[in-house]
């Protein structure tokens, strides 16, 4: 299995099994040398764009963006 696919699978499982999916996503972003600003993602009225493991997703509010990212992750894992 390709390294990126394994990392994506592990990230997906961590997010699904976490108490706070958004906090877990943020931790994964930071672990992968990304930028995560908790105060930015706390505003449910902001347009948020998430990028991780070559998947980009957006939504109004971080929860919406994360749902979009998770849907795209599932699609990529099924390829």
Regions found by a protein language model. Give the residues of each.
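N-terminal segment of the canonical double-stranded RNA-binding domain
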Residues: 1-49, 56, 75-76
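Short, compact, well-ordered microdomains
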Residues: 51-79
């Amino acid at each position: 299995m390709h390294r990126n696919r394994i990392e994506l699978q592990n990230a997906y499982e961590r997010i699904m099994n976490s108490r706070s999916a958004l906090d877990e996503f943020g931790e994964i972003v930071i672990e992968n040398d990304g930028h995560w600003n908790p105060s930015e993602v706390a505003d449910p009225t902001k347009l948020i764009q998430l990028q991780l493991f070559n998947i980009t997703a957006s939504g109004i509010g971080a929860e919406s963006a994360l749902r979009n990212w998770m849907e795209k992750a599932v699609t990529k894992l099924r390829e």
